């Protein structure tokens, strides 16, 4: 929605509206243009704009000031959508014959801004500067965040079991997760997976085994029975993913797949991502799943899950190349496939969601990913 004052020439306001709309269109957003609003006495333009917006499923309302405008005309529209995040965007003047010409956009935004704050709106303030390019990066950052927030409200995560190994950091609180972030977490029992194994189509199993053998790189020979077992688990879990529409999934790992089925689920996770395009985490890490979803919605990229193992004073130390697996033993388990794929190096963003004192917070940092020295986790066959 673009706003201007009734005494400003409508042609100039329309021109500024069209330019701003063009910038947003060029950035690739799915837009609804509610038009130009002025402070006419009977709020005809304001009410028309509000009506255009009615029923549109929006993640963000862009409130664009093309010039000074009395705040009451703006609130006439925005207060009907106070539950929607807003981007308050002040345009700017221009230079003509060596003079600055302005429609006093920031006179409008600096009055609107404290009112929005007083009314409790959730908004971001961005403004243009004469002679500078449009603040596209700031516009995109906020609108993308709003889109991610909206997507989370429809997101569902599946968890086989709960609190693997009695871990603390993987727990979640369902009401706050749904209320504050919007994510619905749906548990299901390992027994569902086990019973689904007998319902699988032999052709699908054979196709899965063929895919693994032809596309994965094996560091040493592997018994086909191990591959078939992993494919069957993935297809059985996939039935539930398809049925419930999950976008991310986490499994009962150590106390479930390893302890009860004697099968570390590394290859199962790889296949679930391949077949069903879901994000995956081990060990009932629901918070890890939600972290992945947030970062995926913000970046548009698949978000891998990694763990910390060591810190170094000077850090010398997603896959790069084919999926690489190694038949290996771990502890009491004598048959399993260990994922030993190479991880891409370069600039990375690392993130983790946490719930503390009734609020969610995200720890985010960037770094340079480098190839680590040779290493393996104690307990696995050497080398692993």
Where are these regions (language model features)?
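Metallocofactor- and cofactor-centric catalytic cores in central/energy metabolism, strongly enriched
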Residues: 1-113, 117-149, 154-158, 163-248
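Anaerobic metallocofactor- and corrinoid-dependent redox/one-carbon enzyme cores
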Residues: 11-19, 67, 85, 90-92, ...
